[in-house]
Design a protein with these regions (language model features):
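C-terminal motif of bacterial Sec signal peptides marking the signal peptidase cleavage site
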Residues: 15-16
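Acidic/polar, glycine-enriched structural segments that form the non-catalytic walls/loops
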Residues: 19-379, 398, 408-414
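Beta-strand segments within the central parallel beta-sheet cores of soluble alpha/beta enzyme folds
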Residues: 27-29, 35, 206, 369, ...
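Carboxylate/His-rich catalytic cores and anion/metal-binding grooves
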Residues: 349, 382-427
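The feature captures the catalytic groove of carbohydrate-active enzymes
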Residues: 367-378, 425-472, 481-533
């Protein structure tokens, strides 16, 4: 029966999409016909450039000129994998304070990180650990168009995201002056480069917010200037370095511009780069550390700063990276399909690859909202990595998944401690977490288990794309440690002579851990992972 079904299905696909022998796919044409186009200010139509480690999202001007207009839609984020912050902890909350003991009939006590709801220190502690750390908005980079200019003053908007090159081109008119903006992201640095051409000599502003610590928002608190600072620590005729200090968090913003321009502080945490010419080209790099030498004096001297790539160099690097991305790996051309849904399906396939490559392919697992804005305080959920990244080895981009899986090794000691305090060997992968592997307290997340087999599944995908001893040696230790926990977590049912799963909340998150036995998805996934390991 299965063979008959698959034969009929294949015949249907070939009929719908044309069964005649096709020439090789014109990949550039495939990508180009799906390039997003924007012709107005639309808070749900922001565009992004990025590299998996860093992403920069813009409005219809090609930069982040009107962030408040987009804050309730798809916000104009500047986010990285390293940019995190924690509010002060004067009460000295400790992670042990959010642990609660449970007995699920496995012969030992199990300690889970819970979210306490009753007023008191435990609630305060669990609230603090859920909020902290949170991901930072690293800074707004927008056009300085003049006092009182509104989005409604701008006309003749024509904007395109060229996914083949990773470049956003934006054209618009303001007060009779035409503006042309090109925006790119460097493939190997947390840096954007842009060129702005206009007879209006419009400047570029850099504005820096304090974090909100909110569950889901653009992470921009513009009413807390007294809680953070931005200072120019190094400047010459073509570059400057700004130092950001937010509580215990410090990072740096390095600028390089071409031609004559002047950088000045307009107000606290607000700087403007003003050109003397019709074109302003600049690069803006965000780093956790100063890229040079710091001489500890009073005040400190910042020397030998990094010389940033120019706009032209960054645009060339971006085009090279994206051309290579699209040229290699899988591609599907739906242009010969007669089904009326084919065009939309093709658009989603192409755009999804671009978005997931810039938002969900970094050195740590992806946030559910990528690097655009904060959800769940900017933290990532390990059960969701499958949706973001399982496609990568299947579509010939194994290297993207490979660099993310390395994170699991760095947090292995944390995962081992979670398993230990619950009375199990091996490692138990956390659900809601951050780059350090800190387990966020939750009355649901801490009891989920469907994230546990993911590591084995994803490592298997890497192996299938490159079946070698090298891959086995790289991942086998963590695969076995993951399986060791899974074996111990399963309870032997002596009456029925079988192993069962209990004391866990299923993926749909509505059932209770104390009364759930053998959730079918988790049970089948456990079986697959144990066989694979």
């Amino acid at each position: 029966m299965k063979k008959v079904f698959y034969s009929l299905f294949a015949a249907f696909v070939l009929t719908a999409c044309g069964s005649e022998k096709q020439a090789p796919i014109d990949r550039e044409a495939l990508v180009a016909r799906n390039n997003p186009q924007v012709a107005s200010f639309d808070s749900l139509a922001s565009l992004s450039v990025g590299n998996g480690e860093f992403a920069f999202t813009v409005d219809a001007t090609g930069l982040q000129t009107f962030p408040s207009m987009y804050s309730k839609g798809v916000p104009l984020g500047t986010q990285s994998q390293w940019g995190w912050h924690s509010f002060a902890n004067p009460q000295g909350y400790k992670s042990e304070e959010v642990l609660k003991a449970f007995d699920f009939g496995r012969g030992h006590e199990e300690l889970y990180a819970c979210q306490f709801k009753e007023e008191g220190r435990q609630k305060e502690a669990s609230d603090w650990f859920r909020v902290n750390p949170h991901r930072l908005h690293l800074g707004i980079v927008g056009l300085e168009l003049g006092e009182g200019v509104k989005a409604s003053d701008i006309t003749d908007i024509r904007q395109t995201l060229n996914m083949w090159k990773g470049e956003i081109t934006s054209h618009f008119t303001l007060n009779g002056n035409a503006f042309d903006v090109r925006t790119v992201c460097h493939p190997d640095q947390d840096m954007i480069s842009a060129s702005v051409t206009s007879r209006a000599h419009a400047g570029v502003n850099l504005r820096f917010p304090y974090p909100t610590g909110a569950h889901a928002d653009d992470a921009c608190n513009w009413d807390a200037n007294d809680k953070h600072s931005t200072t120019i620590v190094r400047q010459d005729a073509q570059s400057a370095v700004l130092k950001r200090v937010l509580d215990e968090t410090t990072y740096y913003v390095t600028l390089r511009w071409e031609g004559k321009a002047n950088l000045a502080e307009k107000s606290k945490n607000y700087f403007v780069l003003t050109p003397d010419e019709d074109m302003l080209a600049f690069s803006c790099l965000f780093t956790p550390n100063f890229q040079g030498t710091v001489f500890e004096s009073e005040p400190p001297v910042y020397a030998d700063g990094q010389v940033l790539p120019s706009f032209t160099e960054t645009a060339a690097a971006s085009a090279s990276y994206w051309t290579n991305f699209w040229t290699n790996g899988a591609a599907v051309d739906f242009s010969h399909c007669t089904d009326p849904r084919a065009g939309e399906l093709e658009r989603r396939v192409v755009l999804s690859q671009y978005l997931l490559a810039i938002q969900s392919a970094g050195s740590v697992p992806p946030q559910e909202t990528g690097l655009t804005y904060n959800s769940w305080f900017g933290k990532f959920h390990l059960e969701m990595i499958w949706w973001h990244q399982a496609w990568q080895p299947l579509w010939g981009h194994t290297d993207l998944l490979d660099r993310t899986l390395g994170w699991y090794e760095t947090v292995e000691p944390v995962a081992r401690e979670i398993a230990r305090r619950q009375g199990f060997p091996g490692v138990r992968w956390m659900k809601m977490t951050d780059p350090n592997g800190t387990e966020a307290p939750s009355n649901v997340g801490s009891f989920l288990i469907w994230q546990q087999p993911h590591f084995i599944y994803l490592a298997e995908l890497v192996y299938r794309s490159n079946p070698s001893d090298e891959v086995i040696q790289k991942y086998n230790k963590l695969v076995q440690e993951t399986a060791e926990f899974m074996y111990a977590f399963a309870t032997y049912d002596e009456f029925h002579g079988r192993f069962i799963l209990k004391g866990a909340i299923p993926a749909q998150e509505t059932l209770r851990a104390a009364t759930t036995i053998n959730p079918p998805f988790e049970l089948s996934y456990w079986h697959f992972a144990m066989q694979t390991a």
